[in-house]
Amino acid sequence: VVRGGPRAAAWRIGAFIARHLFSLPAVVAATACAIAIPVHADGAAGATLARQHWVLNCMGCHTATGGGIPGKVPPLANSLGYFTHLPAGREYVMRVPGASNSALSDQDLADVLNWVLTTMNRDALPRDFKPYTAAEVAAHRRPAFSDVATVRAGLVRALQARGIDGVSDRY
């Protein structure tokens, strides 16, 4: 648990990014993300840690809002949750290279996925959504998909066949 609460943690994260990336926009984005996004995990401490893992491991590419970078990095906000409507989509979320190859433990990755899904994708989740577990992540996260765009496009077609149109096959 970080002393000083979430705001102190946000400033520490911002300072870390400033030291290592020397980027004022990254510091501002990290601080805003760490403070502004609501907590919905299994407790404030767990949610705070999951959010910190997001900031340090995911946000640099997927951006502070989870909106991604058009043409380069897919959005996570308001789209990732749709993939969990399909068993293959649920596996996809764990096997994209950034998740599969991350240095996060299986539990930490499960926590980050659950945090992203429950904070940025609430309306996209199936009604019977079950949070990821460390055991599930350990069983399915590797190997990473080598052609993630093709897998994604196939999943989007399967979602569209079920009447779910919330995510584009291109990003």
List each model region and its residues:
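Detector for the c-type heme attachment site
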Residues: 62-67, 117-118
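Internal catalytic or translocation cores that form aromatic/hydrophobic pockets or channels
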Residues: 103-111, 115
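Flexible coil segments in periplasmic/lumen-exposed cytochrome c-class electron-transfer proteins
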Residues: 107, 118-171
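N-terminal secretory signal peptides that target proteins for export/translocation
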Residues: 1-21
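The canonical Cys-X-X-Cys-His
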Residues: 54-64, 112
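Electrostatic cytochrome c docking/interface patches
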Residues: 34-53, 69
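Gly/Gly-Pro-rich "capping" loops immediately C-terminal to redox-active cysteine motifs
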Residues: 47, 67-102
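Bacterial N-terminal signal peptides
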Residues: 23-34
